[in-house]
């Protein structure tokens, strides 16, 4: 810092001296310091204009005086010009301007342009540019530093953690990254940090698990910035940590890693991902430069990725304007021999035009090179050694040459600049060697002495070598020291010789070939072919480029001559595109350019297309359309090959009807040519479909011919119908359906071929011959053509015609499956003769399960049909059609061939539906269409909803009457439905008998035709094959009988609740999967138990916010039903009904539920009063564990939703604070949850915050993830204590006295305890004012001394300087109080003390701030503050984890014996646990507690705790708790079964449970916790080691012993 001060101080002096001094030659010496000073002050011209700089200095002085009043005089004195006083210079060199303290600023700290902090931010930006030339494009207007204590603290903690882990210093070093954001996002990012999910880039990792930041400050988005663009950039301070390099996912080498899901996940033990190819990006316009230069930061927490990486901290925000006046270079061909390609090591888009040595009088200075981004040539050829001998002052040079020549903005284009009759061009001079810094020394000398190197050139030219500072415009300032020189060439004559196109045309006129008039009219073919050729660039090395052009030129000609395809139209020329620097929105992939250029240079014939070839293509496509109407259609069919199918359907029909009309026949006939043409079309189609050769070409054109059948005009179809009503082909109208893939109609069409009948063809031929004969002039050629087209040599030829069919059906899934009939896919169906009554189906060929969708089944399977000469006519299938609503007469019908050809043919099938047309139900359809068709041979699919009326069956099949089909599957269906209805009816009867409310939500299963099966699926069959309900009931009945016999043998009478009379009801309950167990058993959970018994304190509460008042117990069994039976080992007469019991039941709002269960009511009525009262008392204490919660969120977030769902599942209820305050009871507790990141901005917006703080039953928690709630690792907010903030009226000397202040501080000292600290926070300006008054006023000095005394006791704190301490503001402001409340989040209360009359008190209380006077605070402290100490009053103890050791448990017992409440939402586990103690046990415990005290009591407790833990561990190992018959007590206990807890995770309060000898917990429930703590039984007690054998629980012992022998329930 001292060095920096020494370098800055002389600059300041020199600048002031230059302003005060004169000009002329004296002004040349301090030119360089003046320039530096102007840079430091934010800019200024080089001429030494003093006006703007003095104004800026005055403003800076006022700014410093405004923020630091104590330095006003010093700053003013420093601002005065001193002149040339040499003695003061050493003193000023040692002076250092103090930096502004960031800790005393708000979130945003604006920086003044020209200040040192502003320059530091600019240096960060400029040093992070990818291209140094970006300095001239970015203009930064405003800058603000970001001060976020929370994020900075986390950043420091992260560094400390990494350093503790042994990371290297290189990994811990700080650097900077950048992110361009919208204005509205700045506030959120600076307050909360950068959250994951902010980017859509996936190159380096998943954006949902990390954040992406830009490495370079000039590469902020994927698309280049446009001129005039504005934006905001957030500068982040980053710590890269351990970096992992990621291969480019688009490269071939990392294809496997791209396919792997783990490739996008963050890497453990790392903090950052970068791209392997990042070093290859050397230009802003490089391909994928933005993606490959990103940083990817992430951080792992305990078991998941953090939402905000801590090693990324916002540092500053700057606003910029992008100005891009530089035009895109027109890459002209070089005219100089010393021009070579761009030097890619420096910049990809900078042309290196000359390399050589720079000499000074023959002495080598450095190795340099000349480069330019706009110009590709030098105006003159330079020698390899450039010797410069002349030096000139810049001021003298500007007197001879206009100053505008020395402005860098003048040279923005690729051409020479003409100014004042001089042609000039500018280049950059870069030092090429990395050894030494000779050019830097040269730069310093030129800048310091304001000199210019001059080199005279030939042709009356000059070369000037200048410093970058000498090329700055007067309205700009150089911000970064540049290490390059500028080379300025000046000539009196132009040096750029650009040959225009006009000159070329004049000198070498092109010859215009003959017969090119038509070609020149459609020169658009060139653009069309070149656009289409872009698709072939990937294979440009394997094919000839001219052949690709020929292909697309031919296609263009086809479009132009009416082939039916959309004609290509060249886009109109837009001159505005020439002004744009970037024509495309994103960089294009130009990796193929090098190969193309190489081929273009060394194989130019590949890029040539001769005029002769072009004429051939033109004439070929022009003549191709001029076919004769009587000629064959082979040529037209070849054009429509497989790749042209999508254009062949409708366009051909138009061509065939329009083109022949344009041709003039040489014969003038009177017959109707159109009608003859239509007949020939029909004959040609018949020839191709019936009598054609089975050669490959004929097979190729079949799809085309099928479509030609549809292209016939309306009158021809009518003619065909009238001439052949029932025997010939019925042509169906083509429905206007959309064309599917490859031009095929998506409808299910089945075109049926006629087997051929000589009579049909002869009738057609005779009619045509007769029409020709009746013509006025007989046309022999036409007649011969017709005969040739027919191909008829004899009538017997038609009997030997082969049948061939090839159907292509496109079947897609129906979007309306419920509206369409079911379809069936059949394979390998062999049809028998007419006499065969069976339809055989190869079951092995169809193996798709019924649940498989149609899209999962292959659609290219073939149905092989073996034709038989005796097949019956398809007209016999009157009940069969493609769809029940489609009649058979609309389809293609064909008569059966009379030939004996047995050749097997193949028919392509794609999910052809087989349903009955007249069937009324799926069952009828199934019976009509198949025999022996089990579900194993049927595939249920869906049918296309666009099936038209013209679709029909194309296969002859045998229709078997429905009566002949056995209905095996219907038997299964009826059996299952019968059992289902029987089971449902029995369940309903049992539920009604027990008065259990239920909702029947199970609908009767519907068996469709394709879902019928002989038995259920394997999974269901294996689980339902046995009568599990009956077996369960029998086992339970047997077990209960064993228990009764065992108990009777011991002479213990049982209560009526479990007598044999109730065995039937118990068995009925067991049939539903319920268990009737004793309350002494530990096999069930008691999440919701006996709440109605303790509801007398809850009359005013909302029933929706409390636990359910059910007495049922949830069982963790398949049916999850609830039932409970309470038993007792005491012999109580049946008529003993105690008054306390009736009283408690009467108070319950849910007494109807209890009275509705007679067994439970009888048992409760027979309980002893003491036992029942103990139960009620314990249930009341259990009610204290009912925790309501409220999640405070300003915006919906996934985390809050997850927490809400989790807490709701645990049985907690959500409650708004206002609702809680209105209807709360003494037992209610509320937990307010807020995200830690929202504390600073939203904690004060919690409704009723002041009132909530007063209540001890309200606690606050700050969370970062769901695990914080599960593991109780959240931050406890507003724990205890508080702090006071006062205004100037409290320390006003006219009001306050020393005695009153001492009383107040004494009261504050008594109030503050280690558990609840109180503190008085005083603003800095008040202390400063007391210091100033203390020089003259003894009272102020005494007050200040008293405050200092208590400041040492940490009862008084002087706040650091911040915005409130300004002289123009009144402290404290509302924002200041809110910020202090968030910063001191552990202190519960904030009190604003004032002696003024506050009008808007509600504005303070709404933000959680208590407003009071000093007297009111001391006298009414309890009413103002309420709860504030966790020890002296009822408090919310910290949640005890599952792994607390014995020492921490025993230490809790040493605290005060006040009642404590557990505010845990899941109470250490997920379900509350209850213990029930009898009166005997309570008396024994009470006696032991009274008899022990002091150290003995603590020792006994510790011994008992230790023994209890030992016994529990041993019992857990044995899987089952054993009963100690010699030392037991009548303790009945209800436990609750959790979902998936660990046995080691037991709450600390579980040590205060009943004697370990009475713990009866099975293996299934051994991991559950008991939450009985001090509030259950009042004071801590020691566990008794002796028990009376007379009170042994025989019933429980017998039940457990019998369950060990045989337990069907397990």
UniProtKB/Swiss-Prot annotation:
Biased composition range(s): Basic and acidic residues: 652-671, 697-710, 923-934
Modified residues (Phosphothreonine): 1004
Record organism: Mus musculus (Mouse)
Residue(s) of cross-link: Glycyl lysine isopeptide (Lys-Gly) (interchain with G-Cter in SUMO2): 581, 816, 825, 866
Mutant lacking the gene: phenotype: Embryonic lethality with robust developmentally delayed phenotype observed at 8.5 dpc, progressing through 9.5 dpc with full lethality by 12.5 dpc. RNAi-mediated knockdown in zygotes results in formation of multipolar spindles and increased ratio of arrested or incorrectly developed embryos.
Subcellular location: Nucleus; Chromosome
InterPro entries hit by this protein: PIN_TASOR (IPR056242), TASOR (IPR046432), TASOR_ab_dom (IPR056243), TASOR_DUF3715 (IPR022188)
Major site of localization recorded for this protein: nucleus
Protein's recorded name: Protein TASOR
Disulphide bonds in the chain: none
Region (Disordered): 1-96, 631-671, 687-710, 915-941
One annotated Gene Ontology cellular component of this protein: nucleoplasm
Record keyword Acyltransferase present: no
Phosphoserine carried by residues: 339, 628, 631, 668, 793, 836, 921, 1059, 1508
Tissue expression as described in the entry: Present in skin, brain and testis (at protein level). Ubiquitously expressed at low levels in the majority of the organs, expressed at higher levels in kidneys, spleen, thymus, seminal vesicles, uterus, and ovaries and its expression is almost six times higher in male tissues than in females. Highly expressed in seminiferous tubules with a strong signal in Sertoli cells, spermatogonia, and spermatocytes.
Family: Belongs to the TASOR family.
A Pfam entry, by short name: TASOR_alpha-beta
Compositional bias per record (Low complexity), positions renumbered to this chain: 52-61
Biased segments, Gly residues type: 41-51
């Amino acid at each position: 810092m001292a060095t920096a001060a020494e370098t800055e101080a002389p600059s300041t002096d020199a600048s002031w001296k230059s302003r005060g001094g004169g000009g002329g030659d004296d002004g040349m010496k301090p030119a360089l310091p003046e320039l530096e000073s102007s840079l430091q002050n934010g800019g200024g011209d080089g001429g030494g204009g003093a006006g703007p700089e003095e104004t800026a200095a005055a403003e800076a002085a006022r700014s410093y005086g405004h923020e630091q009043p104590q330095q006003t005089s010093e700053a003013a004195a420093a601002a005065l010009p001193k002149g040339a006083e040499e003695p003061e210079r050493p003193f000023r060199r040692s002076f250092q301007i103090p930096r502004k303290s960031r800790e005393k600023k708000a979130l945003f700290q604006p920086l003044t342009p020209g200040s040192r902090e502003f320059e530091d931010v600019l240096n960060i930006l400029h040093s992070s540019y990818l291209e140094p030339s970006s300095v001239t494009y970015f203009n930064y207007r405003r800058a603000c530093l970001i001060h976020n204590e929370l994020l900075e603290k986390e950043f420091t903690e992260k560094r400390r953690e990494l350093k503790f882990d042994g990371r290297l210093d290189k990994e811990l070093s700080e650097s900077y990254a950048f992110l361009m954001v919208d204005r509205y996002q700045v506030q959120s990012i600076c307050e909360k940090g950068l959250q994951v999910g902010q980017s859509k880039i996936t190159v380096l990792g998943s954006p949902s698990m990390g954040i992406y930041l830009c490495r370079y400050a000039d590469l902020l988005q994927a698309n280049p910035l446009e001129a005039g663009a504005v934006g905001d950039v957030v500068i982040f301070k980053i710590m890269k940590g351990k970096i992992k390099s990621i291969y480019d996912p688009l490269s071939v080498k990392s294809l496997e890693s791209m396919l792997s899901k783990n490739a996008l996940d963050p890497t453990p033990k790392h903090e950052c991902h970068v791209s392997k190819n990042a070093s290859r990006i050397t230009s802003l316009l490089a391909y994928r430069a933005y993606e490959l230069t990103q940083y990817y930061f992430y951080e792992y927490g305990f078991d998941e990725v953090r939402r905000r990486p801590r090693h990324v901290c916002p540092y500053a925000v700057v606003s910029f304007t992008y100005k891009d006046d530089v035009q895109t270079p027109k890459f002209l061909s070089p005219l100089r021999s010393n021009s070579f390609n761009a030097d890619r090591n420096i910049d990809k888009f900078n042309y290196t035009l000359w390399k050589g040595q720079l000499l000074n009088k023959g002495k080598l200075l450095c190795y340099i090179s000349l480069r330019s981004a706009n110009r590709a040539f030098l105006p003159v050829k330079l020698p390899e050694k450039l010797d410069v001998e002349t030096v000139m002052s810049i001021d003298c040079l500007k007197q001879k040459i206009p100053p505008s020549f020395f402005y860098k903005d003048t040279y923005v284009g690729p051409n020479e600049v003409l100014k004042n009759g001089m042609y000039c061009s500018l280049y950059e001079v870069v030092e090429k060697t990395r050894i030494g810094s000779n050019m830097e020394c040269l730069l310093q000398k030129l800048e310091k002495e304001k000199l210019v190197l001059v080199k005279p050139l030939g042709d009356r030219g000059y070369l000037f070598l200048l410093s970058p500072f000498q090329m700055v415009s007067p309205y700009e300032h150089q911000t970064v020291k540049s290490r390059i020189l500028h080379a300025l060439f000046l000539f009196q004559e132009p040096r750029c010789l650009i040959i225009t196109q006009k000159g070329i045309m004049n000198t070498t006129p092109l010859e215009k070939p003959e017969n090119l008039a038509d070609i020149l009219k459609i020169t658009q073919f060139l653009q069309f072919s070149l656009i289409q050729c872009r698709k072939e660039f990937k294979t440009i090395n394997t094919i000839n480029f001219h052949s690709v052009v020929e292909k697309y030129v031919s296609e263009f000609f086809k479009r132009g001559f009416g082939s039916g395809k959309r004609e290509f139209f060249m886009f109109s020329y837009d001159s505005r595109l020439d002004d744009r620097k970037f024509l495309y929105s994103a960089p294009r992939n130009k990796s193929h350019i090098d190969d193309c250029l190489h081929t273009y240079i060394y194989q130019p014939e590949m890029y040539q297309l001769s005029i002769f070839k072009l004429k051939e293509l033109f004439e070929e496509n022009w003549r191709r359309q001029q076919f004769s109407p009587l000629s064959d259609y082979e040529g037209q069919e070849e054009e429509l090959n497989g790749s042209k199918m999508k254009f062949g359907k409708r366009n051909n029909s138009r061509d065939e009807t329009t083109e022949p009309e344009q041709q003039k026949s040489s014969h003038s006939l009177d017959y109707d040519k159109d009608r003859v043409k239509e007949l020939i079309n029909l004959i040609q189609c018949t020839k191709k479909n019936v009598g054609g050769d089975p050669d490959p070409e004929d097979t190729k054109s079949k799809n085309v011919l099928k479509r030609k059948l549809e292209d016939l005009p309306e009158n021809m179809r009518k003619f065909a119908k009238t001439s052949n009503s029932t025997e010939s082909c019925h042509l169906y109208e083509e429905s206007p359906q959309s064309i599917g893939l490859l031009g095929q109609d998506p409808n299910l069409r089945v075109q049926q071929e006629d087997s051929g009948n000589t009579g049909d063809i002869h009738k057609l031929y005779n009619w045509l011959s007769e029409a020709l004969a009746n013509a006025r002039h007989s046309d022999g050629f036409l007649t011969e053509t017709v005969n040739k087209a027919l191909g008829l040599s004899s009538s017997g030829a038609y009997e030997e015609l082969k049948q061939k069919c090839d159907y292509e059906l496109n079947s897609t899934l129906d979007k309306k499956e419920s509206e369409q009939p079911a379809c069936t896919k059949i394979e390998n169906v062999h049809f028998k003769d007419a006499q065969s009554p069976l339809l055989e189906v190869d079951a092995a060929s169809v193996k798709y399960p019924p649940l498989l969708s149609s899209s999962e089944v292959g659609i290219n399977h073939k149905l092989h049909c073996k034709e038989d000469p005796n097949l019956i006519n398809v007209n016999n299938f009157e009940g069969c059609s493609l769809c029940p609503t489609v009649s058979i007469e609309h389809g293609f019908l064909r008569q059966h061939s009379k030939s004996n050809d047995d050749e097997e043919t193949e028919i392509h099938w794609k999910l052809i539906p087989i349903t009955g047309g007249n069937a009324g139900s799926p069952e009828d359809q199934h019976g009509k269409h198949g025999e022996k068709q089990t579900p194993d041979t049927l595939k249920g699919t869906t049918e296309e909803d666009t099936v038209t009326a013209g679709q029909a069956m194309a296969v002859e099949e045998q229709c078997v009457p429905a009566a002949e089909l056995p209905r095996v599957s219907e038997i299964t269906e009826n059996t299952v439905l019968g059992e289902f209805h029987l089971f449902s009816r029995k369940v309903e009867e049992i539920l009604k008998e027990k008065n259990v409310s239920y909702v029947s939500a199970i609908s009767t299963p519907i068996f469709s035709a394709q879902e019928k099966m002989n038995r259920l699926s394997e999974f269901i069959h294996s689980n339902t094959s046995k009568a599990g309900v009956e077996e369960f009931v029998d086992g339970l009945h047997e077990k209960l009988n064993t228990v009764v016999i065992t108990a009777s043998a011991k002479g213990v009478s049982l209560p009526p609740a479990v007598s044999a009379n109730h065995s039937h009801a118990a068995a009925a309950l067991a049939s539903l999967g319920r268990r009737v167990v004793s309350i002494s058993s530990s096999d069930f959970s008691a999440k919701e138990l006996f709440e109605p018994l303790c509801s007398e304190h809850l009359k005013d509460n909302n029933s929706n916010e409390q636990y359910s008042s059910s007495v049922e117990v949830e069982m963790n069994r398949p049916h999850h039903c609830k039932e409970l039976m309470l038993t007792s080992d005491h012999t109580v007469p049946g008529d003993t009904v105690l008054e306390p019991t009736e009283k408690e039941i009467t108070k319950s709002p849910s007494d109807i539920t209890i009275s509705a269960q007679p067994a439970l009511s009888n048992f409760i009525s027979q309980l002893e009063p003491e036992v029942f009262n103990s139960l009620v008392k314990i249930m009341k204490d259990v009610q204290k564990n009912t925790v309501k919660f409220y999640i405070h969120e300003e915006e919906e977030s996934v985390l809050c939703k997850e927490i809400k769902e989790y807490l709701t599942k645990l049985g907690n209820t959500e409650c708004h604070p206002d609702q809680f305050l209105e209807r709360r009871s003494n037992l209610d507790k509320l937990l307010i949850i807020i995200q830690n990141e929202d504390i600073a901005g939203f904690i004060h917006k919690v409704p009723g915050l002041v009132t909530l703080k007063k209540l001890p039953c309200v606690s606050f928690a700050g969370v970062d993830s769901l695990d914080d709630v599960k593991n109780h690792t959240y931050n406890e907010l507003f724990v205890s204590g508080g702090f006071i903030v006062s205004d100037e009226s409290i320390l006003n000397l006219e009001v306050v006295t020393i005695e009153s202040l001492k009383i107040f501080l004494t009261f504050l000292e008594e109030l503050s305890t280690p558990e609840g600290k109180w503190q008085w926070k005083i603003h800095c300006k008040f202390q400063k004012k007391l210091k100033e008054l203390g020089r003259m006023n003894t009272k102020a000095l005494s007050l200040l001394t008293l405050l200092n005394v208590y400041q040492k006791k940490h009862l008084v704190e002087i706040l650091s300087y911040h915005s409130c301490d300004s002289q123009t503001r009144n402290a404290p402001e509302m924002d200041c109080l809110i910020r202090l409340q968030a910063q001191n989040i552990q202190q519960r209360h904030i009190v604003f003390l004032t002696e003024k009359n506050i009008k808007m008190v509600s504005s303070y209380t709404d933000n959680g701030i208590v407003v009071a006077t000093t007297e009111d605070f001391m006298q009414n402290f309890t009413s103002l503050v309420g709860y504030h100490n966790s020890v002296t009053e009822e408090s919310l103890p910290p949640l005890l984890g599952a792994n607390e050791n014995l020492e921490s448990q025993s230490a809790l017992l040493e605290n005060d014996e006040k009642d404590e409440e557990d505010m845990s939402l899941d109470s250490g586990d997920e379900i509350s646990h209850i213990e029930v103690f009898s009166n005997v046990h309570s008396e024994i415990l009470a006696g032991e507690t009274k008899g022990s005290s002091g150290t003995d009591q603590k020792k006994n407790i510790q011994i008992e705790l230790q023994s209890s833990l030992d016994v529990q561990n041993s019992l857990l190992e044995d899987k089952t708790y054993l009963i100690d018959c010699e030392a037991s007590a009548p303790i009945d206990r209800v436990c609750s079964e959790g979902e998936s807890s660990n046995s080691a995770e037991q709450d600390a309060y579980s040590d205060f449970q009943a004697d370990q000898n009475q713990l009866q917990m099975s293996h299934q429930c051994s991991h559950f916790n008991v939450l009985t703590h001090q509030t259950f039984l009042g004071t801590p007690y020691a566990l008794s080691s002796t028990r009376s054998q007379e009170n042994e629980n025989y019933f429980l012992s017998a039940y457990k012993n019998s369950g060990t022998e045989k337990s069907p329930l397990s």
